[in-house]
């Protein structure tokens, strides 16, 4: 990964691959790239992980463009392979929505579809060899005059807690919105304060239900992040091994990891559907 003859240790190699390309505002008011994790921490809230943002937006755009173009060409006569694939995915999503969502809301199925496909695409970046995109980013950085040791690129968006928390917070906002819309502000407040032990235990009920409510987005985010971060770490550790050992370990792990990529997207999507169903239920 180095553009010089400097020896790269295992520790520095791992740290380099686990650090995001961070741009933000330093305490002195200036905006620039972080060269170390400590500099990234100094930025506080105003720190943007450009690698996570760029990869996630590019994959999201590819998803929308692909589905739009295939949708425009859909036909009932001789469907293409792409059309058959999309129809299969949509049928799969609809089956899950019908099985878990017992109310009527035309937004839930598109939300589930977008969530599933987008997370699958972001998770799939974990199957790209760990040095490819960081190397490209380093070469671009050198071309722009940057020190290659200070050019980072973490290519799996879902291995960044900011991405998974961002998605789960979006889902959390929808849960709150539909809970109030379907049950009314009073009904939603009663759900948080009068259950599970009745009105006499209102403070205790509020504590339990509040924790349960907040745990939904937190568990959504951390489950996805933890699994993808662990998978990325294993690929990085395999990359530290001799070349002949890498292929004997990386291929079986990559094949197994395909299951993790799909399973984590499916779990996230399923929980989104379940949480949306709970938000629409009139009774707790």
Curated annotation (Swiss-Prot):
Keywords, in A-Z order: ATP synthesis, Cell inner membrane, Cell membrane, CF(0), Hydrogen ion transport, Ion transport, Membrane, Transmembrane, Transmembrane helix, Transport
Membrane topology field: Multi-pass membrane protein
Residues passing through the membrane, by range: 47-67, 108-128, 156-176, 233-253, 254-274
Complexes and interactors: F-type ATPases have 2 components, CF(1) - the catalytic core - and CF(0) - the membrane proton channel. CF(1) has five subunits: alpha(3), beta(3), gamma(1), delta(1), epsilon(1). CF(0) has three main subunits: a(1), b(2) and c(9-12). The alpha and beta chains form an alternating ring which encloses part of the gamma chain. CF(1) is attached to CF(0) by a central stalk formed by the gamma and epsilon chains, while a peripheral stalk is formed by the delta and b chains.
Similarity annotation: Belongs to the ATPase A chain family.
PROSITE patterns: ATPASE_A
GO molecular function: proton-transporting ATP synthase activity, rotational mechanism
Record localization: Cell inner membrane
Location, primary (coarse class): membrane
GO CC annotation, single: plasma membrane
Function: Key component of the proton channel; it plays a direct role in the translocation of protons across the membrane.
Protein name as annotated: ATP synthase subunit a
NCBIfam families noted in UniProt: ATP_synt_6_or_A, PRK05815.1-1
Lineage of origin: Bacteria, Pseudomonadati, Pseudomonadota, Gammaproteobacteria, Candidatus Pseudothioglobaceae
GO biological processes: proton motive force-driven plasma membrane ATP synthesis
């Amino acid at each position: 990964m180095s553009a010089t003859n400097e020896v790269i240790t295992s520790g520095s190699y791992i740290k380099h691959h686990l650090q995001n390309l961070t741009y933000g505002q330093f305490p002195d008011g200036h905006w620039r790239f972080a060269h170390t994790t400590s500099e990234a921490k100094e930025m506080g809230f105003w720190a943007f992980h450009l690698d996570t943002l760029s990869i996630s937006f590019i994959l999201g755009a590819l998803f929308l463009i692909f589905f739009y173009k295939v949708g425009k060409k859909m036909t009932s006569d001789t469907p293409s392979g792409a059309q058959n694939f999309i129809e299969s995915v949509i049928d799969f999503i609809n089956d899950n929505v019908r099985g878990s969502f017992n109310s009527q809301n035309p937004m839930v199925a598109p939300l589930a579809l977008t969530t599933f496909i987008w997370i699958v695409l972001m998770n799939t970046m974990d199957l790209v060899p760990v040095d490819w995109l960081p190397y490209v980013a380093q070469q671009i950085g050198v071309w722009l005059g940057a020190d290659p040791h200070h050019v980072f690129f973490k290519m799996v968006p879902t291995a960044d807690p900011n991405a998974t928390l961002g998605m789960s917070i979006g889902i959390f906002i929808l849960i709150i919105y539909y809970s109030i819309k379907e049950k009314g502000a009073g009904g939603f407040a009663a759900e948080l304060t009068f259950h599970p032990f009745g009105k006499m235990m209102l403070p205790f009920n509020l504590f339990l239900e509040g924790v349960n409510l907040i745990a939904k987005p937190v568990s959504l985010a951390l489950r996805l992040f933890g699994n993808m971060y662990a998978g990325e770490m294993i690929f990085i550790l395999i990359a530290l091994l001799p070349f002949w050992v890498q292929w004997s370990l990386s291929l079986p792990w990559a094949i197994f990891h395909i299951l993790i990529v799909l399973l984590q997207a499916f779990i996230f999507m399923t929980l989104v559907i379940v949480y949306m169903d709970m938000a629409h239920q009139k009774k707790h």
